[in-house]
């Protein structure tokens, strides 16, 4: 069963994803977002792929293809290794497409032929890494921007509030129209309250009689 942790940039995904790892639940395995892979690919000026994307939108298609390939490879590798267990990923290829790639296509940063090419690749492999449940951490874009500035990552210095607002809206649009079950968590609660919610969710998922014993559709909680 594949569960994806979703949310805007700086919504708290990575923090809570790392917390779930500390619970050391039996037969639960993790797929980190492939950020290090993106940072290891650099241009002739030593700018990594993520920096190139944020600094020049002409690199949009290139980066989205890289994000898709690196994420898909990690997912396929772990699904093959643990086909009957719970796999948790930080984002998925669905959010790559329906949030980030779609947003770039609608803004004109990805051309129509690039969008059609992306969709062809997506459709070829979407069934392999199909998500069974989404845990969505929803945080106001203004708060996300504060967190972006606070963590001060080189690649994110040029991210404006408008981009975070667009990301937020695209997440809401995607998840409200998706057939994938969604559990929504308010990302602006205290970290203690969020962890209490996560603990309850994870305990339900690992119960012996839970539907998650196989990769079938589990708990259905709409946002």
Task: Identify the residue ranges that each predicted region occupies.
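Hydrophobic positions on the alpha1 helix immediately C-terminal to the Walker A/P-loop
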Residues: 16, 20
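Glycine-rich phosphate-binding loop used to anchor ATP phosphates in small-molecule kinases
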Residues: 58-129
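NTP-dependent small-molecule kinase module
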Residues: 145-223
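P-loop (Walker A) phosphate-binding loop of NTP-binding proteins
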Residues: 8
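A glycine- and Lys/Arg-enriched "phosphate-lid" helix/loop adjacent to the NTP-binding pocket
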Residues: 97-169
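Conserved lysine of the Walker
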Residues: 13
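Hydrophobic anchor at the beta1->P-loop junction of P-loop NTPases
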Residues: 5
């Amino acid at each position: 069963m594949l569960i994806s942790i979703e949310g805007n940039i700086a919504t708290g995904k990575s923090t809570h994803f790392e917390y779930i790892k500390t619970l050391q639940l039996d037969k639960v395995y993790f797929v980190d977002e492939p950020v290090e892979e993106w940072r290891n690919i650099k241009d002739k000026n030593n700018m990594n792929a993520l920096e190139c994307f944020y600094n020049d939108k002409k690199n949009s298609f290139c980066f989205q293809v890289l994000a898709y390939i690196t994420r898909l490879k990690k997912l396929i590798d772990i699904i093959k290794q643990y086909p009957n267990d719970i796999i948790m990923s930080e984002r998925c290829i669905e959010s790559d497409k329906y949030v980030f790639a779609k947003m770039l296509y609608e803004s004109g940063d990805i051309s129509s032929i690039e969008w059609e090419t992306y969709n062809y690749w997506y459709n070829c492999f979407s069934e392999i890494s199909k998500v069974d449940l989404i845990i969505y951490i929803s945080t106001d874009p203004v708060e996300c921007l504060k967190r972006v500035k606070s963590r001060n990552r080189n690649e994110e210095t040029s991210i404006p509030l408008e981009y975070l607002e667009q990301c937020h809206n695209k997440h809401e649009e995607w998840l409200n129209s998706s057939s994938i079950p969604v559990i929504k968590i308010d990302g602006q609660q205290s970290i203690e309250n969020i962890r209490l919610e996560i603990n309850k969710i994870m305990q339900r998922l690992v119960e012996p009689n839970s539907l998650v014993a196989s990769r079938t559709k589990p708990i259905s909680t709409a946002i």
